[in-house]
């Protein structure tokens, strides 16, 4: 199990360094910038998987996590059902998915509705537009 997590962490760190991140949102109130790597999109019949990077202006903390400056996640979007779920997330000590991985979670979340007027809605639109194109 530890070996698998190490391999996943190294793969994410390596892909972060080589990824071509495109900024899709900046929220000055929250101090976040959200990026998407369109080269990582994986399409199936009705879902799209996409890599997302959330970069923070200030270090973030949660009750059970060490401080982190960015989160690299893979999300899956159901275009017809307007739902989404997080498949994987890695929390990084530095901006843009760099630095030590302070925490990772590879347990897929349950499907949930994409909230209206949210960054997740914008991400869903980007993902599903890519599905419709091809």
Residue ranges and their predicted role:
Residues 17-134:
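N-terminal secretory-pathway/extracellular module detecting exported/lumenal segments
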């Amino acid at each position: 199990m530890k070996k698998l997590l190490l391999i996943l962490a190294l793969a994410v760190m390596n892909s972060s360094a080589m990824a071509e991140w495109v900024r899709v949102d900046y929220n000055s109130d929250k101090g976040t910038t959200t990026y998407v790597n369109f080269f990582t999109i994986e399409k199936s019949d009705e879902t799209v998987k996409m890599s997302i990077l959330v970069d923070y202006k200030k270090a973030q903390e949660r009750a059970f996590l060490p401080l982190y400056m960015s989160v690299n996640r893979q999300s899956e979007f159901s275009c017809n059902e307007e739902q989404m779920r997080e498949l994987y997330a890695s929390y990084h000590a530095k901006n843009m998915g760099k630095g030590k991985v302070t925490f990772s979670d590879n347990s897929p979340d349950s499907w949930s509705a994409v909230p209206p007027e949210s960054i997740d809605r914008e991400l869903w639109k980007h993902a599903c537009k890519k599905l419709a194109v091809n």
